[in-house]
Amino acid sequence: MLLIIFPKIILNSKDIRVCLCVLAKLENKYIIQYIEHYKKIGVDKMFIYDNNDLNGENFDFILLEYIKKKFVEVINFRGKISPQIKMLNDCYKKNNKNYDWFILFDADEFIELKYFNNIKLFLNQKIFNKCDYIYFYRAYQTDANKIKFENKSLSERFSTSVYPVHTYKPILRGNISNLKIHGVHKLNFKLKSCNSFGKSKDKTRDFKINFIKHYYFKSTEEFIEKVNRGDGVFNNTEGTKLTKIKFYFKINKMTLEKINYIENKTGISLLFLKKKIKK
């Protein structure tokens, strides 16, 4: 007989409000999946900071129904260079009195909670009473050796091959006075952090119960679109692009087809990688 032991969960009594702040650029293919994922688990509001180029994609039409229902608010950050930290501070400063918790995940980061189907129940546990923010480790979903985009859900396309990493993303408590956020991972050294089990000094990395599925790469085509557009933190130099490409092949299978595709789309010579394949 199989014995299943569920964790003992002690909840606070009060109702809480949860929002999500995210910087988004060239995410029209995936943004609905992202919104529906967090809506399904009980998030009250999503603040989407539109960081597309001035003449680039636009969220207003594709998100019109969510905007009408006031579930989504789009904030104009179009054309801004490396504005991630500025976005986090702006979102928190304007809204910290209205929400108990702020999810500060990227647009390709999907939280997984094994024992909860509602994030409010998870966050309302007494184990988090003394935590200023809760950190979740990320597990990269590999490219599944897919070169091109497919019009399917991310979970269908990249359902296996999880690569765990040591970096994490936070869910931050609201109503912290005069808070200045300095980083996207460790927000502020003065804040008390806890892991997803409420422990402040436990460095155990969990990738099975409470963690983030990080669809950072997707297919080779989509990864290179990400590389070419840049991110919200670093300047998009050739050196930065090359660092990301090396990281891509550290985690995903290196093939000549992928290398040739990346060279063609970035204009960066990857001869040193081709030599590794021939060895």
Each PLM stretch: what is its role?
Residues 44-53, 75-78:
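Short beta-strand/loop segment that forms part of the nucleotide-sugar
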